[in-house]
From Swiss-Prot:
GO BP terms, alphabetized: amino acid biosynthetic process; aromatic amino acid family biosynthetic process; chorismate biosynthetic process; shikimate metabolic process
Organism: Prochlorococcus marinus (strain AS9601)
Gene that produces this protein: aroE
Name of the protein described by the UniProt record: Shikimate dehydrogenase (NADP(+))
Keyword annotations: Amino-acid biosynthesis, Aromatic amino acid biosynthesis, NADP, Oxidoreductase
Sequence similarity: Belongs to the shikimate dehydrogenase family.
Enzyme Commission number(s): 1.1.1.25
């Protein structure tokens, strides 16, 4: 029962109306018997610092950070984990003993979760998009030992910055979505991962669209695994299209749960819940 002593954890982003995190996190908090609730708070770019400073002064125990704040929030944190610092992208914060924000990134572990048993070592992959989520995905693909990682984006400046971020750790190929070479890569890819918001179910985005338009996908073959980080709607228009082509498809739900478990552990100093607790809550809701 919520009381005057109840603390909260919040999801900060814009938009957040589509988020399923409150469903699964509140199920987990109830499972653990903690006097905590999880809420979603819409936050515009210009309000981010004000919101984070305000939350320091009330019963906030931690935050999830989502689009479009994963990179900007770096400057507002006093402690940053090695993985978050490397990726320059943050999705989880907690208040430390000095009432300052400590930050980490649980997206890499979440992203890998559905791929662990698919034997993708030495395979070819494409990442669509060049924002904060793409950084986590690329790190995950490096961890899985894929041989080729190509990044396709419509934003040249963020694409160049993304490739620079990984330096000499792996040879990344960057292309604009209008480049003819993209069709060759799509035809040969073993795995394609969408990190763009195209297809997300919100008032801000149309959910019946595909990343870069349907003609961009004309060379997709049935042997390719298509992984869309979007989890609402599930399946997305992209995954429906890919399934009709005969592709194996993966939506963002397993990643959402897996990263959520790691975030919860970060907020609670090591407590964990079984995967099924969050997953069952989502399935019941959906």
């Amino acid at each position: 029962m919520i009381s005057s002593k109840t603390s909260f954890i919040a999801l900060i982003g814009n938009p957040v109306s589509h988020s399923l995190s409150p469903i699964m996190q509140n199920a987990a908090l109830q499972y653990l018997g903690l006097d905590l609730i999880y809420i979603a708070v819409p936050c515009k770019d210009e309000d981010l610092e004000l919101v984070l400073n305000s939350f320091k002064k009330i019963n906030c125990k931690g935050l999830n950070i989502t689009i479009p704040h994963k990179e900007k929030v770096l400057t507002l944190c006093s402690e940053i984990s090695p993985i978050a610092n490397k990726l320059k992208a943050i999705n989880t914060l907690k208040l430390n003993s000095e009432k300052k924000w400590s930050a980490t990134n649980t997206d890499v572990e979440g992203f890998i979760y559905p791929l662990k048993n698919l034997n993708l070592a030495k395979k070819k992959s494409i990442v669509l998009g060049s924002g904060g989520a793409a950084r986590s995905v690329i790190q995950g693909l490096i961890n899985l030992n894929l041989s080729t990682i190509s990044v396709i984006s419509r934003n040249k400046s963020s694409l160049d910055e993304l490739i620079k971020n990984f330096g000499n750790e792996i040879q990344l190929q960057g292309l604009l979505n209008s480049d003819d070479q993209a069709q060759v890569l799509i035809r040969e890819a073993d795995l394609i991962v969408n990190t763009t918001p195209a297809g997300m179910k919100t008032t801000k985005y149309k959910n019946n669209v595909m990343p870069y338009g349907e003609t961009f996908w004309r060379s997709l073959n049935s042997q390719t695994i298509v992984y869309d980080l979007i989890y609402n709607p599930a399946p997305t228009t992209l995954l429906k299209f890919s399934a009709r082509k005969g592709c194996k498809t993966i939506d963002g739900l397993e990643m959402l749960v897996a990263q959520g478990i790691k975030s919860l552990s970060f907020w609670t100093d090591g407590l964990e819940v079984p995967f099924h607790v969050m997953n069952d809550a989502l399935k019941k809701y959906l």
